Amino acid sequence: MLLTGGTSHTFPVLEIDGRAIGDSSEIIAALEERHPERPLYPDDPEQRRRALELEDFFDEELGPHIRLLAFHELSKDPERFEAVIARTTPGPVARLGSGAVTYARTYTGLRFGVRDEGAAELARTKIIAALDRLEAELGSNEYLAGDSFSVADLTAASLFFPLVLPDEGPVPTDEPPPAGIASFRAPLEERPGYRWVAETFRKHRR
C-alpha cells in the first residue's frame, strides 16, 4: 500500500516508467507489453484463454491461502519471522528498521488472520485442492497451456514456492521450514505436482 498509493495490498511491486504496479497479473501484463520477445501469453487463442484462466485460479484459490499458512506457521517463531521479513521486505518498507517487523506482523494479522487455526486448516484444504487441480490440468504434459512456459506455469509454480521451497526460489532456503510446514508437506513430496514445482524452478528460474 505504501508503494502503490493504496491501490494494491500485495507484493511484489514493480516500478516501471514511474508507475508502481502491485498486482502480479498486472505486472506480468506490463512486462509482456514491454518485452514481447519472450512471451508468457500463448499466441493460440484457446491456449491463451486457458493460461489466463489458470493464472486467475491459482491467484485466487491458492495465493491467499498459501500466504496465510506460511505466515501462520512463521508467527509461532518470532525470531524466524523477523529473519524472513528482513530478507524479503522491499526497500521502502525495510527502511522502517525495526518498525518493518511491527508493520509486517500487524499487516499479516489483519489481512490474513494468521493466528486463526480454523483459517489455517481451511488454507491446508485449499492448498491440497490447488495441488489436485495442478496435477489434473498437467496430466502427462510439461506445461499447463500449450508446449511452452506460460503465465499459467509461472503463477502456479511461484505461488507453491512457500510449500516446496526449491533452492532456486526468491529467498534463501538454507534453513528447514517451520515445523508446521514441514509436517504438512511431508506426505505431498512425492506427488507429481510437488515435483513439477521443483522442476519448473530448476529449469526456468534464472
Listing of model-derived features with the role each one plays in the protein:
Residues 63-176:
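GST-like fold's C-terminal all-alpha helical module
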Residues 28, 32, 52-55, 59, ...:
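Non-transmembrane alpha-helical segments in soluble domains
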Residues 1-95:
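GST-like domain detector, emphasizing the conserved glutathione-binding G-site
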Residues 12, 36, 112, 118-119, ...:
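Residue-level detector of alpha-helix boundaries and kinks
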Residues 45, 117, 121, 187:
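Charge-dense, low-complexity intrinsically disordered segments
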Residues 159-204:
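Short His-centered aromatic/hydrophobic patch
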Residues 22, 46, 61, 122-125, ...:
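Generic recognition of short, well-ordered alpha-helical interface segments
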Residues 26, 50, 65, 80, ...:
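Exposed alpha-helical structural elements
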